[in-house]
Amino acid sequence: MKSQMVSEHPRASAVRSVLRKLMGSGEAGVKAAAAISSDGLVIASVLQEGVDADRFAAMSASLLALADRAIVETKRGSLKQLLIEGTNGAVLLVQAGDDAVLAVSTDPGALIGKIFIDARSAAGELRVCLGG
């Protein structure tokens, strides 16, 4: 795991603390986490080696924007989260205020229900931390 420090963001340290708390002991299966601005910039991240934080952030923001548009078009209210499942795990994207997204990557055998609960809680902490 590597931590990416974004010195330009004044709350990066506090955000990283929330991300590390979400990752915890690894029991639930969270492998990586990132806080991303709605325009696709990394606020702070704790990602696996070999994952390009900037690319991950841009793709996550794009996916969330498309999902949000689909929710609006189908008149389903406001987007809360997006789950993408693959054969080697999942990626969960959760709104963390008007201008931020929490992205979580999991193991294949992750406890998705627990991760949903923990991610929503972390997104709430990020919302407060980032003032949004």
Label each PLM-derived region with a short phrase.
Residues M1-G132:
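Non-catalytic interaction/Regulatory regions outside core domains
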